């Protein structure tokens, strides 16, 4: 496999897409995070009964954020825990929902997993979107105003979850990591880059990178933006300018913790050249696992097992 991967990595290096970071990108996010943290954190806990109660304890958490939305998450830790433990903050893929990660907890760590707002779970999106919102499509919500765009909201929610993890009495705040694939891979990067709580970032098949190219191709969740611009071509420059503030290809420059990336050469959603461009622009300590025939929608066992051994050793 090594020769095949090396040949493909050399080809990917020639296709790296440059960053298009706005000059005020850092200030934009500093302002947004300041606004988020100006809202005092409130966490409501309720013990849950699950099929895994013999080995782990689980609570439902209801958390306030920067707007009227209430974020709902599940927090689990080993049932026999007697001291503060590491915590994996898990971010799910697009249009999925939180889960009970008994496999992660079995490594001896806690796990926190939130429902991303507006994607079918319990976190109902209460934000006011003054523009876009074509047929309820997520990526057109607030599209013309970067201060009210959907991605701004879920990125801030991801940072909020890191604040939650650091506040929980069961968690050692010095041993928090982020983990996710696709949409979750992007949120993992954002949460590790901006929260100040992360020890390490794990990101698989990261979405929300090279957004301009995804809009041009009309792939997956960005097909709605492509359709919007067909209808309103006069908004093209404004939309592309706004999207640059949320492209993790640009935001990855703020990532300072060690990060493990993973891409599949058969991925037709988050294309290999997109994910490799993201990896290329990261300035932190980093590794990348390139899997020759792995498509989207599947967290590879090889990456997962290596990561779980690291969880066990935290």
Give the role of each language-model region:
Residues 254-256, 261-263, 267:
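Short beta-strand/loop motif that positions the catalytic acidic residue
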Residues 1-56:
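N-terminal targeting or regulatory segments adjacent to alpha/beta-hydrolase or S9 domains
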């Amino acid at each position: 496999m090594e020769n095949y991967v090396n040949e493909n990595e050399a080809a990917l290096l020639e296709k790296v897409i440059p960053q298009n970071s706005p000059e005020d990108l850092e200030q934009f996010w500093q302002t947004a995070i300041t606004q988020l943290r100006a809202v005092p954190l409130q966490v409501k806990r309720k013990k849950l009964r699950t099929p895994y109660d013999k080995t782990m304890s689980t609570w439902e958490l209801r958390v306030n954020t920067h707007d009227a939305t209430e974020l709902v998450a599940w927090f689990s830790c080993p049932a026999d825990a007697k001291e503060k433990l590491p915590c994996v903050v898990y971010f799910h893929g697009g249009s999925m929902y939180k889960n009970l990660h008994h496999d992660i907890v079995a490594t001896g760590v806690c796990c926190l997993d939130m429902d991303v707002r507006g994607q079918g779970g319990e976190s109902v999106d209460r934000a006011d979107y003054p523009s876009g919102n074509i047929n309820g499509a997520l990526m057109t919500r607030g599209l013309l105003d970067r201060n009210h765009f959907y991605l701004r909201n879920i990125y801030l929610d991801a940072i909020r979850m890191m604040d939650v993890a650091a506040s929980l009495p069961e968690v050692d705040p010095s041993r928090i990591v982020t983990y996710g694939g696709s949409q979750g891979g992007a949120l993992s990067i954002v949460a590790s880059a901006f929260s100040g709580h992360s020890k390490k970032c794990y990101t698989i098949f990261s979405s929300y990178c090279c957004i301009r190219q995804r809009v041009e191709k009309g792939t997956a969740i960005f097909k709605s933006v492509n359709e919007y611009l067909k209808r309103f071509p006069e908004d093209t420059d404004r939309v592309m300018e706004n999207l640059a503030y949320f492209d993790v290809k640009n935001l990855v420059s703020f990532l300072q913790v060690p990060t493990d990336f993973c891409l599949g050469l058969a991925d037709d959603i988050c294309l290999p050249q997109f994910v490799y461009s993201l990896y290329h622009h990261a300035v932190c300590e980093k590794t990348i696992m390139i899997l020759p025939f792995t498509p989207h929608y599947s967290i590879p066992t090889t990456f997962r097992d290596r990561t779980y051994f690291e969880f066990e050793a935290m």
